[in-house]
């Protein structure tokens, strides 16, 4: 029987209707976060899709030293707490160091381990100590079966609820590809698997001083992943992605999200029919 992770009234499992994890790449301020959350709560309620809000207080791995990193942990968590209380939605955000885990866990329901840090044992252990759900993004440099080692570490540290995320694999320079087999391979570890449709179209460092991306392929990859069968769909969105402070070329335009989700629900239903 496939593992099911429970978060409030949300059930996350590879055989269950997909959960949507979405929000802007980074926190840009309280007003923007509340604006985005309100739009996303209304949309997901209308479409009856379980929703988890995601946004980052720090983009610690920006390509350039001049890249905008975010509002920082103190202000960021204050804003995420406001989103959580005002819209009664669970929160996921990423942690980049052991020192951030305890403080972040006071607000976030899920701690996300960035792909570049997925093998950092001390970070995994610190996240585990919070007792929160731990969501690990598979490194672009890892085979899907290598995530067994990450799972073993987390379980050794006492984590009961683990989520894995596929976000593409390095394919030459400045390019990623998505191997849809990895979704099934990681699911065989009895861990709910999430597909990151927006970071999978990244072109890391492709713009020289920043990361490029091919937004036009987000829907295509999302359909493919949903056809395989996933526990969650991860998509970063923005009302004006071309002017967003980070990952603009990858993020979905908010106005286009509803039509894509309607299609994904159909794919998901067919895939999971008994």
Swiss-Prot record:
Its EC number is 2.5.1.55. This is 2-dehydro-3-deoxyphosphooctonate aldolase. Belongs to the KdsA family. It comes from Rickettsia africae (strain ESF-5). The keyword Disulfide bond does not apply. The lineage of its organism: Bacteria, Pseudomonadati, Pseudomonadota, Alphaproteobacteria, Rickettsiales. It is an enzyme of class 2 (transferase). GO terms for biological process: keto-3-deoxy-D-manno-octulosonic acid biosynthetic process. InterPro entries: Aldolase_TIM (IPR013785), DAHP1/KDSA (IPR006218), KDO8P_synthase (IPR006269). The keyword Transferase applies. It is found in: Cytoplasm. It catalyses: D-arabinose 5-phosphate + phosphoenolpyruvate + H2O = 3-deoxy-alpha-D-manno-2-octulosonate-8-phosphate + phosphate. One of its GO terms (cellular component) is cytoplasm. GO terms for molecular function: 3-deoxy-8-phosphooctulonate synthase activity. Pathway: Carbohydrate biosynthesis; 3-deoxy-D-manno-octulosonate biosynthesis; 3-deoxy-D-manno-octulosonate from D-ribulose 5-phosphate: step 2/3. Keywords: Cytoplasm, Lipopolysaccharide biosynthesis, Transferase.
């Amino acid at each position: 029987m496939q593992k099911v992770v429970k978060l409030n009234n949300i059930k996350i499992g590879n055989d269950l209707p997909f959960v949507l994890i979405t929000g802007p790449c980074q926190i840009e301020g309280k007003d923007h976060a509340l604006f985005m959350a309100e739009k996303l709560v209304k949309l997901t309620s209308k479409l009856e899709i379980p929703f988890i809000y995601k946004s980052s207080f720090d983009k610690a791995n920006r390509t350039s030293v001049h890249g905008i990193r975010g509002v920082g942990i103190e202000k960021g968590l204050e804003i995420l707490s406001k989103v959580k209380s005002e819209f009664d939605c669970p929160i996921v955000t990423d942690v980049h160091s052991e020192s951030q885990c305890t403080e972040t866990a006071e607000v976030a329901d899920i701690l996300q381990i960035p792909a570049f840090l997925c093998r950092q044992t001390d970070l995994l252990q610190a996240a585990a100590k919070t007792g929160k759900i731990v969501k690990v993004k598979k490194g672009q440099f890892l085979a899907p079966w290598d995530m067994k080692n990450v799972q073993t570490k987390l379980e050794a540290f006492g984590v009961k609820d683990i989520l894995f995320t596929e976000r593409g694999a390095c394919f030459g320079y400045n390019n990623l590809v998505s191997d849809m087999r990895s979704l099934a391979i990681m699911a065989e570890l009895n861990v709910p698997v999430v597909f990151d449709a927006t970071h999978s179209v990244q072109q890391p460092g492709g713009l020289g001083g920043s990361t490029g991306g091919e937004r036009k392929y987000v829907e295509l990859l999302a359909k493919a992943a949903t056809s395989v069968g996933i526990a969650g769909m991860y998509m970063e969105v923005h009302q004006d992605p071309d002017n967003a402070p980070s990952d603009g070329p990858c993020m979905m335009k908010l106005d286009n999200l509803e039509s894509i989700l309607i299609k994904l629900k159909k794919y998901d239903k067919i895939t999971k029919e008994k």
